[in-house]
């Protein structure tokens, strides 16, 4: 007898296949970011290099461009750039995941691709807390078709815990370890977030070890984050990293400007003890970056991908039948107790026509240019020592009628500013990152049809900060300009590349 989830899987796959090539007409459909063929996408899940290919799973609702009972979408790649959409991996409907296959991870268990995910059950529609969440397993030999194995971890660390989700598993000294987020409630707060640590010998029988870290007064988070979602725990350089997505932090100055955050704490790990040594630091300074997940590339690089969106932000692409995409894959490094992120070198595969201007000097002036395509990579070096302008930078995706996305250095604030108040349909707001204390600032920019990603560096280090935001300009907004306001600005180098549309391949996949 076919299980309810198998029937739902067939329906989901049928919805994905019916999408066909209709998204090619969407003016905002990305050219080089992983994006659903139809419906809704959020958290990346199960990133792994398995049998010679990179696999990316993701939270997916294929029936409409809104959040619904979560499935696991699936894509694979050989180069981290060209992704092939595969059949839907998981669908909800069984007793243990009736209302959603929530986020989780993937591990290679002796040649068996094994997914560990959260089964979500709604107990009542009267409250968001009337839920039950358990950790489940599914396995695959071919890496495409999965067999559910049911619940492997049922009990949360404490009684009466409803929110208990997003397992991340790794192997260390012949033991499997798992971190998973959970929430305890008290009378004064909406909730308090924690990360629990478990251990197993076989991936099926898990023992609670301890609460790895909780939202307490010893951390600058205080008791303000009511849930810690999507935890990850890994080594980078000579430090251990606890990465997670806290919900409920209040904005403070330039920090915590989004509804929810994504960041990390550095510390020392002597199993089973994690000793934090830094405060919580955000990974990205843009409007749209959440639920990041990390994995190890075939050459040992630590690579991160995040959901390139944010809860409650406007999603104009819903009119075209899709919502959500992933950030570019980013290489992680640890420099001076800070994680730095740079786009993976494989992105250079997409470079086509190149335009180079060696030195551009402006004095209260503009330097216009035209983009051949909305798919652009830009490298700009700004000489701070030789410049006096109050503001200097770029206007991108302009149409000559007021539509533009502004990226500029503001000397009065010592910040790099992204202003998307005129960036197209239903988006607004300003985000910023610190201006590096350096003589020259390097801006590495990727423009897709509905996004901008900026990597900020100094003389020595690329990727000190990143700013990732969605924009929704008109398709003919292809003008740009360099500018300097109230003084002169020296741009030592200005390089631009038109990029190939890597996502066209997704529409010719046999799986879709």
UniProtKB/Swiss-Prot annotation:
The active site is at 43. CDD domains: GH32_FFase. It catalyses: Hydrolysis of terminal non-reducing beta-D-fructofuranoside residues in beta-D-fructofuranosides. PROSITE patterns: GLYCOSYL_HYDROL_F32. One of its GO terms (biological process) is sucrose metabolic process. Disulfide bonds: none annotated. It is found in: Cytoplasm. One of its GO terms (cellular component) is cytoplasm. Pathway: Glycan biosynthesis; sucrose metabolism. Substrate binds at residues 40-43, 59, 67, 102-103, 165-166, 229, 311. GO terms for molecular function: beta-fructofuranosidase activity. Pfam families: Glyco_hydro_32C, Glyco_hydro_32N. It is an enzyme of class 3 (hydrolase). Its EC number is 3.2.1.26. Keywords: Carbohydrate metabolism, Cytoplasm, Glycosidase, Hydrolase. It comes from the Bacteria. NCBIfam families: scrB_fam (TIGR01322). Belongs to the glycosyl hydrolase 32 family. This is Sucrose-6-phosphate hydrolase. The gene is sacA.
């Amino acid at each position: 007898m076919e299980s309810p989830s198998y029937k739902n899987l067939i329906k989901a796959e049928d919805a994905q296949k019916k999408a066909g090539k209709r998204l090619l007409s969407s003016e905002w459909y990305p050219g080089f970011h992983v994006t659903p063929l139809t419906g809704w996408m959020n958290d990346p899940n199960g990133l792994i290099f398995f049998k010679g290919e990179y696999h990316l799973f993701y939270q997916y609702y294929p029936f409409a461009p809104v959040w619904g009972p979560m499935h696991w979408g699936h894509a694979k790649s050989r180069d981290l750039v060209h992704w092939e959409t595969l059949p839907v991996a998981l669908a909800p409907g069984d007793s243990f995941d009736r209302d959603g296959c929530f986020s989780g991870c993937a591990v290679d268990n002796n040649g068996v691709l094994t997914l560990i995910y959260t089964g979500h059950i709604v107990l009542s529609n009267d409250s968001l807390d009337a839920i039950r969440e358990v950790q489940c397993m599914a396995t695959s030999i071919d890496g495409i078709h999965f067999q559910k194995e049911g619940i492997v971890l049922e009990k949360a660390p404490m009684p009466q815990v409803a929110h208990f989700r997003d397992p991340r598993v790794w192997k260390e000294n012949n033991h499997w370890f798992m971190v998973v987020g959970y929430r305890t409630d008290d009378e004064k707060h909406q909730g308090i977030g924690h990360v629990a640590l478990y251990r197993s010998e076989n991936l099926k029988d898990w023992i609670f070890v301890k609460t790895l870290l909780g939202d307490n007064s010893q951390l600058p988070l205080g008791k303000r984050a009511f849930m810690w979602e999507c935890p990850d725990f890994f080594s980078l350089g000579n430090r251990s990293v606890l990465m997670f997505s806290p919900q409920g932090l209040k904005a403070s100055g330039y920090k915590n400007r989004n509804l929810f955050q994504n960041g990390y704490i550095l510390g020392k790990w002597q199993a089973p003890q994690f000793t934090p040594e830094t405060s919580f630091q955000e990974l990205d300074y843009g409007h749209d970056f959440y639920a990041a997940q990390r994995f190890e590339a075939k050459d040992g690089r630590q690579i991160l991908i995040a959901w390139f969106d944010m809860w409650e932000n406007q999603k104009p692409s819903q009119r075209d039948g899709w919502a959500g995409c992933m950030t570019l894959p980013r290489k992680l490094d640890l420099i001076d107790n800070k994680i730095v992120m740079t786009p993976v070198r494989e992105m250079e595969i997409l470079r086509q026509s190149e335009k180079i201007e060696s030195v551009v000097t402006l004095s209260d002036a503009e330097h216009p240019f035209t983009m051949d395509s909305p798919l652009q990579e830009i490298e700009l070096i700004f000489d701070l020592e030789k410049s006096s302008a109050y503001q200097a930078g770029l206007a991108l995706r302009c149409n000559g009628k007021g539509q533009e996305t502004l990226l500029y250095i503001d000397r009065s604030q010592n910040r790099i500013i992204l202003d998307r108040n005129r960036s197209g349909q239903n988006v607004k707001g300003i985000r910023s990152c610190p201006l590096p204390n350096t003589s020259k600032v390097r801006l590495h920019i990727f423009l897709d049809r509905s996004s901008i990603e900026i990597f900020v560096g100094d003389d020595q280090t690329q990727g000190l900060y990143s700013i990732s935001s969605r924009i929704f300009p008109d398709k003919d907004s292809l003008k740009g300009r360099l500018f300097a306001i109230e003084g002169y600005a020296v741009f030592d180098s200005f390089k631009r590349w038109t990029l190939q549309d890597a996502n066209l391949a997704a529409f010719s996949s046999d799986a879709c």
